[in-house]
């Protein structure tokens, strides 16, 4: 995902113009059909020959869709929405779950506006909520929103992490500190190999005692209020993917982490 200071680019605006300038007949054909909107994104090519960047794609995306179908999460959150590809892909699956809601957190207002237009075009705007701002701030807002909206809210069912890599751990510690992770919560993190998220991979594979030491030593850039929860027991599996994407050979992996319980406190 783009860096926090990235205020958008001409490329993303070109893509939005492409969608807005589609013939009315084509717009009518894809409206309300998430799979056709995704196809439009997949097939779009910029003048320089490149495609829309930072999309989860059908291979890794299909793997995560399988997890959604298996777990049937009612509340799913993504960190890093970009132009809405994953929100449409995963939000479409969430729409099949009674009471399901998908929250997409995106720091860049320009990207979020484009994502909203695409989500609306896909007919998922009543399922997908796009929140603009730093993930740490939006997570606090979301927690209060869910507590107010649903008195029975306990924790998030599923979290998809795909934003700025050096914020994977700090923002996960925010989620932990807000008590939004409980046994059964599933964390799915993209780009573990390319471009790489080694600190996150290490963190979710730590024992509770190792995580307690880490949290005591490493200050969270999001603030002292978000030290994290060392007593959460995580079980992590890494799924590797390899193949050719737009004529480039790529290798990547997704970390799938489940909270399976609590460690006993001293």
Curated annotation (Swiss-Prot):
Record SUPFAM superfamilies: S-adenosyl-L-methionine-dependent methyltransferases
UniProt-recorded name of the protein: Probable catechol O-methyltransferase 1
Residues holding Mg(2+): 162, 190-191
Localization (cell): Cytoplasm; Nucleus
Entry binding sites for substrate: 165, 191
Gene3D superfamilies: Vaccinia Virus protein VP39
Reported cofactor(s): Mg(2+)
Its EC number(s): 2.1.1.6
Catalytic reaction annotation: a catechol + S-adenosyl-L-methionine = a guaiacol + S-adenosyl-L-homocysteine + H(+)
Keywords, ordered alphabetically: Catecholamine metabolism, Cytoplasm, Magnesium, Metal-binding, Methyltransferase, Nucleus, S-adenosyl-L-methionine, Transferase
Any one GO biological process: methylation
Primary localisation category: cytoplasm
GO molecular function: carboxyl-O-methyltransferase activity; metal ion binding; O-methyltransferase activity
Domain of life: Eukaryota
Gene Ontology terms: cellular component: cytosol; nucleus
UniProt: S-adenosyl-L-methionine binding residues: 56, 78, 86, 106-107, 135, 162
Disulfide links within the chain: none
Cofactor comment text: Binds 1 Mg(2+) ion per subunit.
Sequence similarity: Belongs to the class I-like SAM-binding methyltransferase superfamily. Cation-dependent O-methyltransferase family.
Protein source organism: Schizosaccharomyces pombe (strain 972 / ATCC 24843) (Fission yeast)
InterPro entries with a match to the protein in the record: SAM-dependent_MTases_sf (IPR029063), SAM_O-MeTrfase (IPR002935)
């Amino acid at each position: 995902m783009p860096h926090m200071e990235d205020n958008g680019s001409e490329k993303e605006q070109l893509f939005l113009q492409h969608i807005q300038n589609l013939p009315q007949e084509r717009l009518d054909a894809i409206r309300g059909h998430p799979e056709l909107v995704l196809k439009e994104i997949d097939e779009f090519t910029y003048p320089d020959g490149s495609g829309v960047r930072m999309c989860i794609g059908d291979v890794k995306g299909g793997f995560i869709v399988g997890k959604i179908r298996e777990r049937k999460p009612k509340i799913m959150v993504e960190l890093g929405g970009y132009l809405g590809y994953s929100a449409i892909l995963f939000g479409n699956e969430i729409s099949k779950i009674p009471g399901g809601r998908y929250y997409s957190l995106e720091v860049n207002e320009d990207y979020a506006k484009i994502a909203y237009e695409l989500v609306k075009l896909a007919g998922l705007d009543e399922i997908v909520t796009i929140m603009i701002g730093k993930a740490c701030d939006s997570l606090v807002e979301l927690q209060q929103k869910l507590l107010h909206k649903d008195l029975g809210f306990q924790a998030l069912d599923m979290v998809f992490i795909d934003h700025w890599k050096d914020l994977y751990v700090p923002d996960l510690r925010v989620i932990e500190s807000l008590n939004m992770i409980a046994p059964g919560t599933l964390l799915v993190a993209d780009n573990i190999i390319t471009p790489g998220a080694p600190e996150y991979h290490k963190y979710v594979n730590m024992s509770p005692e190792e995580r307690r030491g880490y949290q005591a030593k490493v200050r969270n850039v999001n603030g002292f209020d978000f030290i994290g929860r060392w007593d959460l027991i995580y079980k992590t599996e890494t799924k590797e993917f390899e193949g050719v994407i737009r004529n480039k050979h790529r290798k990547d992996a997704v970390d799938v982490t489940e909270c399976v319980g609590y460690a006993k406190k001293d």
